[in-house]
């Protein structure tokens, strides 16, 4: 067996489509790897899969063909038309590997039945393509937070509830995480949805000996905050308030126009700033849907701070970007790094991947410089496989059994050129800034 699978949950959304087009373009050497962190010199020698080693499939509840979605993104200025033309055949091949996702409104029977189908889809994909492993990445629509129930804490109780046709104990993102872990696959949550962040799912990951990472990809406004906030702290300047407004269109804007859907996103953004500056900073944050913006996203921030002798000053900044173009290369980076971690015997939360997330699992470190150092140091150590186990919140776990197969070493930054509803589908369905 050889190769790595990338299984996208929300495979026909903007982020997923951009990632697939980008992967195909990198493989064909049509574009440079701009925005791909794992192509930096610091990752030379890290045993990462090459672009040509990655095979893509996925789930989605939307049926718009991948090529059609890519055409829409090209018309929006996100994908060059020459790249679209050159990757059309590859897009059709990936589209043929996308299966129907789980939707609670259309599913009948117990959630365990849905899990069995999802697991079969993933394992059949892994087997038919002779893959060493599959990384499942959630780029589906942002979900609202869910009420806590005791089944979220205990794996045996969760499994019993999943078998009950009268209950829907897991939201779609967490059901997909459960299916991925059950299939022996690593899981990455690029959304602020509940997803992997349940104690019972942590226990399942450790029992299966697979790693997971998340949550909520950091691509725009929050990225700037994690760079700038430590500057104020290091210079002993007192931040009094940090107000932010996000303007966005497309499916992302429509999805987050619902206050319930936006709640998880706002909470994810707020946690990082509070961790960096403390709870005493006034930090109102708004997300507004502006359909005219399409795929573009604009963030306005106003920072009020106090200096020596009480001098009042402010910083204002504007960030305008194409979110899918910022997120897509990170999806490819996370696939490579998580696959390498799995091959090296890592299991449980990959806190070292905090660099990529607004609300990272397994760590409270939000300072971007420290996250960068943590990531590069950790990646270099992946050359030396070692099993790792992580304790459950309520007790000890058995040592996981690491995989025995190994990935080919990547010897140079340029080596390996060959290479639910989508985040965002607009069908744009997730959000990452």
Residue ranges and their predicted role:
Residues 387-433:
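Actinobacteria-biased recognition of intrinsically disordered, low-complexity terminal regions
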Residues 27-48, 188, 198-254, 263:
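Catalytic or ion-translocation cores adjacent to nucleophile or general acid/base/metal-coordination motifs
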Residues 143-145, 194-196, 220-221:
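Short, small-residue-enriched loops and turns at beta-alpha junctions
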Residues 7-10, 210, 221-351:
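Active-site-lining helix/loop region of Rossmann-like oxidoreductase modules
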Residues 1-183, 187, 199-203, 323, ...:
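Metallocofactor- and cofactor-centric catalytic cores in central/energy metabolism, strongly enriched
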Residues 156-163, 206-212, 311-315:
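Glycine/charged-rich beta-loop-alpha catalytic/anionic-binding loops adjacent to active sites
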């Amino acid at each position: 067996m050889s190769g790595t699978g990338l299984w996208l949950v929300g495979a026909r959304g903007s982020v997923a489509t951009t990632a697939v087009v980008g992967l195909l373009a990198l493989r064909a050497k049509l574009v440079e790897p701009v925005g791909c962190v794992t192509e930096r010199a610091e990752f030379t020698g890290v045993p990462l899969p090459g672009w040509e080693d990655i095979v893509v499939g996925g789930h989605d509840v939307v049926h718009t063909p991948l090529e059609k979605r890519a055409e829409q993104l090209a018309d929006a200025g996100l994908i060059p038309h020459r790249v679209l033309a050159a990757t059309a055949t590859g897009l059709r091949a990936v589209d043929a590997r996308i299966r129907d996702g789980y939707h609670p409104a259309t599913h009948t029977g117990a959630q365990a039945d849905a899990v069995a189908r999802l697991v079969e889809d993933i394992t059949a994909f892994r087997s038919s393509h002779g893959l060493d492993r599959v990384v499942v990445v959630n780029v589906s629509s942002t979900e609202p937070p869910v009420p806590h129930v005791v089944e979220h804490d205990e794996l045996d109780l969760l499994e019993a509830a999943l078998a009950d046709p009268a209950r829907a104990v897991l939201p779609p993102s967490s059901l997909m995480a459960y299916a991925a872990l059950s299939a022996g696959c690593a899981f990455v949550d690029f959304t602020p949805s509940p997803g992997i962040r349940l104690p019972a799912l942590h226990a399942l990951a450790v029992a299966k000996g697979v790693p997971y990472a998340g949550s909520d990809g950091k691509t725009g406004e929050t990225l700037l905050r994690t760079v700038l906030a430590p500057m104020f702290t290091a210079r002993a300047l007192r931040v009094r308030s940090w107000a932010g407004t996000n303007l966005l269109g497309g499916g992302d804007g429509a999805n987050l126009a619902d206050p319930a859907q936006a709640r998880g996103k706002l909470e994810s953004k707020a946690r990082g700033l509070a961790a960096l500056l403390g709870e005493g900073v006034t930090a109102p944050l708004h997300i507004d849907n502006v359909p005219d913006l399409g795929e573009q996203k604009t963030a306005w921030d106003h920072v009020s701070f106090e200096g020596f002798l009480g001098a009042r000053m402010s910083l204002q900044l504007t960030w305008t970007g194409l979110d899918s173009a910022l997120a897509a290369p990170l999806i490819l980076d996370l696939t490579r790094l998580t696959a390498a971690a799995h091959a090296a015997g890592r299991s449980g939360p990959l806190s070292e991947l905090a660099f990529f997330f607004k609300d990272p699992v397994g760590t409270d470190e939000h300072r971007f410089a420290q996250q960068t150092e943590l990531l590069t140091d950790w990646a270099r150590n992946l050359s030396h496989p070692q099993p790792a186990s992580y304790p459950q919140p309520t007790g000890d776990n058995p040592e996981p059994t690491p995989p025995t197969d190994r990935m080919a070493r990547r010897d140079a930054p340029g080596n390996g050129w060959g290479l639910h509803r989508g985040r965002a589908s607009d069908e744009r369905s997730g959000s990452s800034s």
